[in-house]
Amino acid sequence: MGVTELGKLIGREARREIKLENLAGRCIALDAYNALYQFLASIRQPDGTPLMDRQGRVTSHLSGLFYRTINLMEAGIKPVYVFDGKPPEFKLAEIEARRRVKEKAMEEVVKAIREGKRDDVAKYMKRVIFLTNEMVEDAKRLLTYMGVPWVQAPSEGEAQAAHMAKRGHCWAVGSQDYDSLLFGSPRLVRNLAVSPKRRSGEEVVEVSPEVVELDSVLKALKLKGREQLIDVAILLGTDYNPDGVPGVGPQKALKLVLEFGSLEKMLDTVLRGVSFPVDPLEIKRFFLNPPVTEEYALELKNVDERGLVNFLVGEHDFSEERVAKAVERLKKARARQKTSSLDSFFHGA
């Protein structure tokens, strides 16, 4: 999901840069699809194509998930990945629109290959990111072999992750998007699944994890509660109404909510006559009461070393030497977390 325009309203006073080590001992509910798409977009070969095994199956998402999760665990973080389930009915039209955009980009890739334009191939390949059911199941298998818990959400993954954070079972949601705040997560941690260095145009910039707290956002924007933040997001555009209200930018959206108090009042006044492809009040109700499950286990399990090697090296042609070294790192990180948990138990920390 993605409420990109909302991020423009969230200033530095509501953000706090941190180091991975600052999250040691914390359980972070990571938006699995968001992370996998990040890996698919960033882990590419020079020609723009993703990493693949000998059978032509994409492995960029597995490489990113494997090595980045180990980095998080070495920092003492307890990750749990939450996978999307069935999307709400009113999101299906947007999903179809995205599919058409990707198909158009693929046509441009084929054209660029035919014309020998390598730069164009790389450019358009980054727009052709498909996450298939097989790729998702492989990601779950990888996490299981690593002993890392994952949760299957009944609907939106960020809604489930936010629910777990609200209940205090996880400290925060990890995602690049801000939707978890709309779903009620007390905290959002961004930049966990991305490389510490990211290319911005021609420059390589340092990227640090940052914490965004819901209460700090509401205070900074002078909003009375999460419902008003949802109202602002709907005016700007969400995954369910990506175009938002024509002519309404971040500052105007905030001004309207502060002036009228609620989306309901605006629909009867200033927004009367505005056409919405999806009932905005239905979107609001979904953010406030999304489908979630209480059936999840967040405990880290033992590493299945043989399963990992067979899966990554045997099935997907990863380097045996690199995987062996990474598995040792994973086992050491897991052992340190167990020791830390025992120390906390016996010393009441």
Swiss-Prot record:
Cofactor detail note: Binds 2 magnesium ions per subunit. They probably participate in the reaction catalyzed by the enzyme. May bind an additional third magnesium ion after substrate binding.
Domain of life: Archaea
Binding, Mg(2+) 1: 31, 84, 156, 158
CDD domains per the UniProt record, alphabetical: PIN_FEN1
Span list, region I-domain: 120-261
EC assignment: 3.1.-.-
GO molecular function, one term: magnesium ion binding
UniProt-annotated binding residues for Mg(2+) 2: 177, 179, 239
Enzyme class: hydrolase
SUPFAM superfamilies membership: 5' to 3' exonuclease, C-terminal subdomain, PIN domain-like
Gene Ontology BP, a term: DNA repair
Pfam family membership, one: XPG_I
UniProtKB keywords: DNA damage, DNA repair, DNA replication, Endonuclease, Exonuclease, Hydrolase, Magnesium, Metal-binding, Nuclease
Database matches in InterPro entries: 5-3_exonuclease_C_sf, Flap_endonuc, Flap_endonuc_arc, HhH2, PIN-like_dom_sf, XPG-I_dom, XPG/Rad2, XPG_CS
Cofactor: Mg(2+)
Annotated spans, N-domain: 1-102
Subunit structure: Interacts with PCNA. PCNA stimulates the nuclease activity without altering cleavage specificity.
Job of this protein: Structure-specific nuclease with 5'-flap endonuclease and 5'-3' exonuclease activities involved in DNA replication and repair. During DNA replication, cleaves the 5'-overhanging flap structure that is generated by displacement synthesis when DNA polymerase encounters the 5'-end of a downstream Okazaki fragment. Binds the unpaired 3'-DNA end and kinks the DNA to facilitate 5' cleavage specificity. Cleaves one nucleotide into the double-stranded DNA from the junction in flap DNA, leaving a nick for ligation. Also involved in the base excision repair (BER) pathway.
Family assignment from sequence similarity: Belongs to the XPG/RAD2 endonuclease family. FEN1 subfamily.
Protein name: Flap endonuclease 1
Gene transcribed to yield this protein: fen
